[in-house]
From Swiss-Prot:
The gene is ispDF. It comes from the Bacteria. 4-CDP-2-C-methyl-D-erythritol 2-phosphate binds at residues 220-222, 246-247, 268-270, 273-277, 344-347, 351, 354. InterPro entries: IspD/F (IPR026596), IspD/TarI (IPR034683), MECDP_synthase (IPR003526), MECDP_synthase_CS (IPR020555), MECDP_synthase_sf (IPR036571), Nucleotide-diphossugar_trans (IPR029044). Keywords: Isoprene biosynthesis, Lyase, Metal-binding, Multifunctional enzyme, Nucleotidyltransferase, Transferase. Pfam families: IspD (PF01128), YgbB (PF02542). This is Bifunctional enzyme IspD/IspF. Pathway: Isoprenoid biosynthesis; isopentenyl diphosphate biosynthesis via DXP pathway; isopentenyl diphosphate from 1-deoxy-D-xylulose 5-phosphate: step 2/6; Isoprenoid biosynthesis; isopentenyl diphosphate biosynthesis via DXP pathway; isopentenyl diphosphate from 1-deoxy-D-xylulose 5-phosphate: step 4/6. GO terms for biological process: isopentenyl diphosphate biosynthetic process, methylerythritol 4-phosphate pathway; terpenoid biosynthetic process. It catalyses: 2-C-methyl-D-erythritol 4-phosphate + CTP + H(+) = 4-CDP-2-C-methyl-D-erythritol + diphosphate; 4-CDP-2-C-methyl-D-erythritol 2-phosphate = 2-C-methyl-D-erythritol 2,4-cyclic diphosphate + CMP. Its EC number is 2.7.7.60, 4.6.1.12.
Amino acid sequence: MLDVTLIVLCAGNSTRFEHKTKKQWIRVEDEPLWLNVTKRISSFAKFDKIIVTSHQDELNYMKNFSDDFTFVKGGETRQLSILNSLQFVTTKYVMITDVARACVPQSVIENLLNEKSSADCIVPILNVTDTVVYENDTIDRSNVKLIQTPQLSSTQVLRDALNTPIEFTDESSAIKAIDGKIKYIQGSTFSKKLTLGDELDELPCLKAPSNNFFTGTGFDIHAFEEIKDMYLGGVKLPYEYGFKAHSDGDVLIHSVIDALLGACGAGDIGEFFPDTDDKYKGIDSKLLLGQIVNFINNVGYEIVNVDLTIIAQKPKINPFKDEIKKSMAKLLRIEKQFVNVKATTAEKLGFIGRAEGVAVQSIATLKYYNWKKR
């Protein structure tokens, strides 16, 4: 083995990316970018361990994609994400890269590994080819270098270097600050960092997302409860009962949430909003759906349509179907034509037929966010 751990940093918020999906979750065919980058680099060498950092909100979901990596909750900053990851590193050396460096070539990885014992930090750099101006003065561009990742460091030296309140933008800066030895090697233009959304077309290794569709179903049922308002699809219905539930009991929204989570393979509503958590007691279900729609978009999907079946003896649903469609379209951020609402009774059979509650069955269809068309 190499005695090297690979860390791939994927916990950022993509605030400058200007796409509805976070950069680490855009699809390359059927793979999220973080998985594509991790598999690509790990194919170039036999690392002792591979660590992937994730935003806390996406950590459990990310674990669904592979059992071959160690997933670690990222920090508020790049440096904190590295510190969190270093707790799981036992090798002498560590190679750290950013998911934004999507097309790092094999030659860079091999050159880093070949030089691992020659300095405390091995750093790929590029010469500057454009004219450089600093504070209105043109400076000698031969003295300016562009620092890239991945970088390969001595694990212990890096731990010592990051044990400071000072924030560094890369490992070499931190190690240089404690007088560590830095060695520069030739970088690559293919290791360009993806920061802005319009830079996607400059990365030749990225293929467009597939045209696959993903379908999920949801089902929820709630009994009636006195002295409570009834909400269905975010619409307040004039009925004498509400729904018995930990939240406001909007059975339609709860069903849709499960359908959305099912379509992207992210579990169910109870995993995101457990009914044992007091912060969700009496909560407006529209807020819960908003969080799920944000999650769906963040991890690379767009909502195509939903088909909703409300099963109720009472109240009568037909007079409110159009209002429910409008409400759900707004909440799901899709056009009204892509929301279908059906209503049926239980023919006076069972719990629902005795007018003791309402059930809703939902089907949701998703597709990958197509960054190629933006």
